[in-house]
């Protein structure tokens, strides 16, 4: 595959932003989220106008996908509610997860840190742009977003508003980047040619999308199949019961 200067620039920007993001304290991260949340209300008419543009251009998609694509004031309120919940989360960074002492007296700690740069490929739902941007920023991760072409204008304005909030709060706006070129070559490049920039890829969509991502990705993939039904077995759990559950 030929060198892609557009995607290379996005990758480099994300890597630089992720290094800066490590040093942004919780209070400042939350201030960005609060400002973005206010923008969702202030610019709601512009968001709905962009979404209506997507709806008008939508061709050949089924009713369920069209329903996921369509935004209204209630859905924007739900997006704002999600952001408020994320703001309430305790700081996920710098937490001591476990601690133990070695026989030689050395104390070892397992401490939570950001993953780095996350690539997200998703379909239909514009609210994913809002939710994922907020979650990644809260957890100290830069994110590269590639939404479905059917939601292009909706995703673009939502990512632009988050970048506006970042810039207003003197944070690197490239903590959040949206691939605003529709060519599928950019997706292939993201999956196969950017392991030096991207730490993990997360696909969110149907089985065919997950299958393609897993087949082409040259970086770790956090994917799902028919349902997101994970089981975490704590060290204190009853293992016999856990085996039955799994």
Task: Describe the function of each predicted region.
Residues 113-116, 123-181:
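A glycine-rich phosphate/pyrophosphate-binding beta-strand-loop-alpha-helix module
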Residues 100-109, 122-134, 189:
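Short, charged beta->alpha transition segments
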Residues 95, 145, 177-180, 202-205, ...:
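General beta-strand structural signal in soluble alpha/beta enzymes
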Residues 188-200, 206-215, 237, 244:
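Active-site/ligand-binding-proximal alpha/beta "capping" segment
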Residues 1-110:
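N-terminal Rossmann-like NAD(P)+-binding subdomain of aldehyde/semialdehyde dehydrogenases
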Residues 72, 85, 103-110, 177-195:
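A structured beta-alpha segment of the ubiquitous adenosine-cofactor-binding alpha/beta core
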Residues 13, 124-142, 161-168, 210-246:
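ALDH superfamily catalytic-core signature
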């Amino acid at each position: 595959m030929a060198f892609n200067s557009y995607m290379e620039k996005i990758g480099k920007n994300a890597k630089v932003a992720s290094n800066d993001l490590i040093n942004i304290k919780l209070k400042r991260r939350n201030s960005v989220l609060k400002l973005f949340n206010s923008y969702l209300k202030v610019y709601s008419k512009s968001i709905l106008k962009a979404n209506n543009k997507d709806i008008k251009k939508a061709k050949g998609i089924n009713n369920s996908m069209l329903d996921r694509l369509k935004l209204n004031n209630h859905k924007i309120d739900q997006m704002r509610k999600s952001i408020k919940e994320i703001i309430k989360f305790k700081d996920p960074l710098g937490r001591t997860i476990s601690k133990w002492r070695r026989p030689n007296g050395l104390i070892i700690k397992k401490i939570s840190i950001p993953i780095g740069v996350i690539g997200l490929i998703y379909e239909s739902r514009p609210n994913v742009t809002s939710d994922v941007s907020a979650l990644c920023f809260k957890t100290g991760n830069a994110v590269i977003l590639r939404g479905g072409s059917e939601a292009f204008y909706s995703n673009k304005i939502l990512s632009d508003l988050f970048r506006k909030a970042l810039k207003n709060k003197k944070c690197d706006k490239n903590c959040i980047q949206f691939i605003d070129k529709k060519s599928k070559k950019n997706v292939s490049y993201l999956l196969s040619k950017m392991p030096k920039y991207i730490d993990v890829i997360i696909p969110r969509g149907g089985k065919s999308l997950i299958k393609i991502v897993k087949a082409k990705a040259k970086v770790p993939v956090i994917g799902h199949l028919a349902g997101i039904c994970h089981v975490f077995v704590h060290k204190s759990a009853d293992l016999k019961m856990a085996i039955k559950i799994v």
